[in-house]
UniProtKB/Swiss-Prot annotation:
UniProt xrefs under Pfam families: PH_21
Gene Ontology annotations for the cellular component aspect, listed alphabetically: cytosol; nucleoplasm
Region (Disordered) location: 1-30
LRR repeat start and end residues: 663-686, 687-707, 712-732, 736-756
Nucleus listed as a keyword: yes
Modified residues (Phosphoserine): S349, S377, S382, S660
Subunit structure: Interacts with FLNA.
Source organism (scientific name): Homo sapiens (Human)
Domain PH: start-end pairs: 54-163
Distribution of this protein across tissues and organs: Isoform 1 is expressed in peripheral blood mononuclear cells and kidney. Lower expression in brain and liver. Expression is down-regulated in activated cells. Isoform 2 is expressed in lymphocyte precursors, however, expression shuts down during maturation and differentiation in thymus and fetal liver.
Name this protein carries in UniProt: C-Maf-inducing protein
Listed InterPro entries: CMIP, LRR_dom_sf, PH_CMIP
Length: 773
């Protein structure tokens, strides 16, 4: 039977042969030829007319015509004896098969066996038919209408050619030929009338597999392939293996124009449309490496800043809601990668997940590696898999470089204990409190990690500058989503302080409320950057700003004041003593609302208020409303007094000169910055019986002065002070001493024996961690 073919009517495309390459110039140019500063772009030669969905299966009539070789076979294959069979055909990756393998379709038809696919158009031919030319015959497919016929035609063409390209590109020999085939494959996808996600993804997956199996390509070959597939990436996410290839190129050639011209629209699309980096972590890693590549350019952060501006847009409100969450996710992952090598390499360093799950047990093992990170591991996926394993380790890390311990608060809270099965979470900030002996510890990162950290912290700063992004950014950062190593890193907390300051300056409640903890029992940025917190480096200036904005909002309540009184009364008093108006107002409100029940604490607050002009004025206004407070002050000074941590000699002098302290019997200067110079003020307290100098810089000179004047002192705590035998020997004149703590001092055994002999009332002595122990 004479079977002819035609392009069909209606002007629609009926047959697609190999499309011509769309790159300008000779496609056979050698690989080494440079493409110019700007990668070439292809025009999208989209077919006019109908669009079709790629078929994967469907019902159709099938007829097979065998080529006649004898007179009898010619009679048997004539149109009068021809029969049609209904089949449900599946267009698999390798062949055309029937759901009921009988009759004509007893055996599947491989795409490699199909020589040609054409539309039938001859006189008296069956309507809506396709012709598949195979060795020894022809397969006719009859659809129900012309649209289905064309849909089957284009789908079969696509499946056949994709199968061919998979075969051709699976065994590359000459890379100039491979590059030409890739370009033709891309052009075929761009000009196809089929509309389906796999139309663009299939070529990308073929190229991705090709690159993963050939890792010895030159840089120029890398760039040529990237430029060739660039048109497909404008509307499609790259597959995971292709992301790995892009990451490698960003690391090895950060200054390549391909990074700017090709990767920029790809990353922009990822940030605008990605919904969950957890399902595609390599997209996040590619975005991370792309931004680092931008940072390596001559302009550095200026280029990154312009990129962030382009993502936000020129208006006051970013039109893409997914950009900010995706940028924050990339920043958090990059910052974590800076510390991840240290987290994974130290046996006694738990992951942040373990801390949040309450997996804490004391451990005395010494770390084997210094706190120094070189290059972060590029395989973020494997790192995340490692971190997901539960490792029940300690959160107490002791070494010459870092010492992290659980702080014992002055409110006598129960000890923090948790087991692996406990649902309660430990206080993260308490876990980060650095002991005074190690307060000068600094974490040093390697050069690459340091650049990465600086880049992404700077991005967080840029994000915080946009008013429309700030509420969401504050909400995302409210749970403190950083590893404890980062929070113990002075450089990180110092740089991040700008972001927290922006939150504190924002008048919107939805922003500055995120400074507080995400729920009760958890610490937030408010606690982290308050005096005594691990991130505080400004003596409470940021803390005062946060309190000011919170008090100016709906937090001017008794509950908020009670929280301050229970947790941050010391910092509030210290800042008020230094003239901070916000803190003076806070103390006045505490008195006015009867937040403080203890009379001694009330007297201490009053003395603090009267030590400054602004405090005295506000206190006088308060006294006009509450005369009973003034009456309380007339009864005399407090018997117990505790100075806030980080108080100085000047702070103590100012406080003691502001009122009467003749009845003061118990004074605690623990964890302050006082020195021996304060001794001249202490000796003016004739009734003083108990003095706590734990972890201060009080030395031998001050100790000698005290021993001459405070002969009635009964309890003295010198734990972790720099005193030596020269000063300790002077204590022999304090015959009333009944309790003496010399823990962690330079006490010698001989001096200890001498003091025991000369102090008959001495009953309690602590000489642990000394030579006399």
């Amino acid at each position: 039977m004479d079977v002819t073919s035609s392009s069909g009517g209606g002007g629609d495309p009926r047959q697609i042969e190999e499309t011509k390459p769309l790159l300008g110039g000779d496609v056979s140019a050698p690989e080494g030829t440079k493409m110019g500063a700007v990668p070439c772009r292809r025009a999208l030669l989209l077919c006019n007319g109908m669009r079709y969905k790629l078929l994967q299966e469907g019902d159709i009539q099938v007829c097979v015509i065998r080529h006649p070789r004898t007179f009898l076979s010619k009679i048997l294959t004539s149109k009068f004896l021809r029969r049609w069979e209904p089949h449900h055909l599946t267009l698999a990756d390798n062949s055309l098969a029937s759901a009921t393998p009988t009759g004509y379709m007893e055996n599947s038809v491989s795409y490699s066996a199909i020589e040609d696919v054409q539309l039938l158009s001859w006189e008296n031919a069956p309507k809506y038919c396709l012709q598949l030319t195979i060795p020894g015959g022809t397969v006719l497919l009859q659809a129900a209408n012309s649209y289905l016929r064309d849909q089957w035609f284009h789908s079969l063409q696509w499946k056949k050619k994709i199968y061919k390209y998979k075969k051709v590109l699976s065994n590359p020999s000459r890379w100039e030929v491979v590059l030409k085939e890739i370009r033709t494959l891309v052009d075929m996808a761009l000009t196809s009338p089929l509309q389906d996600d796999s139309i663009n993804q299939a070529p990308l997956e073929i190229v991705s597999k090709l690159l993963s199996e050939n890792t010895n390509l030159t840089t120029q070959e890398h760039e040529n392939i990237i430029v060739a597939i660039a048109p497909l990436l404008e509307n499609n996410h790259p597959p995971p293996d292709l992301c790995e290839f892009f990451c490698k190129h960003c690391r090895e050639r950060p200054r390549s124009m391909v990074v700017i011209e090709v990767f920029t629209p790809v990353v922009q699309r990822i940030l605008k449309h990605n919904m969950d980096f957890g399902k595609c972590p390599r997209l996040r890693l590619f975005t991370q490496e792309y931004i680092l590549a931008l940072n390596e350019l001559n302009a550095g952060m200026e280029v990154v800043k312009k990129f962030i501006q382009s993502m936000h847009g020129p208006t006051g409100h970013c039109p893409h809601p997914r950009v900010l969450p995706n940028l924050v996710a990339v920043c958090l992952a990059a910052i974590y990668s800076c510390y991840e090598e240290f987290i994974n390499s130290r046996d006694n360093s738990p992951s942040l997940k373990e801390i949040r799950n309450g997996c804490q047990q004391p451990c005395d093992r010494k770390p084997t590696l210094p706190l120094r990170l070189l290059h972060p591991s590029p395989d973020l996926v494997s790192q995340e898999a490692t971190l997901s394993e539960a490792r029940l380790k300690s959160v107490v890390v002791a070494s010459s470089e870092i010492h992290v311990e659980v702080e014992r608060t002055s409110t006598a809270k129960p000890a923090l204990t948790a087991s692996a099965g406990n649902d309660s979470e430990p206080n993260l900030i308490d876990c980060l409190m650095v002991s005074p002996a190690c307060s000068t510890m600094s974490i040093e990162l390697g050069p690459q990690a340091d650049r990465t950290l600086g880049c992404y912290v700077e991005i967080l700063k840029l994000l915080s500058d946009y008013d429309d992004w700030r509420p969401s950014l504050a909400s995302l950062l409210q749970p403190i989503p950083f590893p404890k190593e980062a929070l113990a890193h002075e450089k990180f907390t110092k740089e991040l302080k700008y972001v927290i300051q922006r939150f504190a300056e924002d008048p919107r409640q939805e922003v500055h409320s995120c400074l507080l903890s995400v729920r009760a029992g958890k610490d937030g940025w408010f606690q982290l950057y308050s005096p005594g917190g691990v991130a505080c480096d400004d003596d409470g200036e940021l803390f005062a700003s946060m309190v000011h904005i919170l008090m100016g909002s709906c937090y001017k309540t008794k509950k908020f004041l009670l929280s301050l009184a229970e947790n941050k009364l010391g910092p509030c008093m210290l800042l008020a003593l230094r003239g901070n108006q916000t803190m003076v107002e806070i103390l006045c409100l505490m008195l006015e609302y009867n937040i403080i029940d203890n009379n001694d604490t009330q007297l201490q607050i009053i003395s603090t208020l009267e030590s400054t002009d602004v405090g005295k004025r506000m206190y006088e206004q308060l006294c006009d409303r509450q005369r009973e407070l003034k009456e309380l002050q007339r009864k005399g000074g407090p018997t117990r007094l505790t100075l806030p941590s980080k108080s100085t000699d000047a702070d103590l002098a100012r406080l003691l000169s502001s009122g009467s302290f003749g009845n003061l019997e118990n004074l605690s200067l623990a964890f302050t910055n006082v020195t021996s110079a304060c001794a001249e003020h202490l000796i003016k307290l004739p009734s003083l019986k108990q003095l706590n100098l734990w972890s201060t810089q009080f030395g031998d000179a001050g100790l000698r002065l005290l021993s001459e004047h405070l002969t009635m002192l009964q309890v003295l705590n010198l734990c972790e002070t720099p005193v030596t035998d020269a000063g300790l020997l002077a204590l022999s004149s304090m015959k009333s001493l009944c309790s003496l703590n010399m823990n962690s001092t330079k006490l010698s055994a001989d001096t200890y024996e001498d003091l025991k002999a000369k102090l008959p009332n001495l009953k309690e002595v602590d000489v642990r961690y000394t030579e006399a122990w």
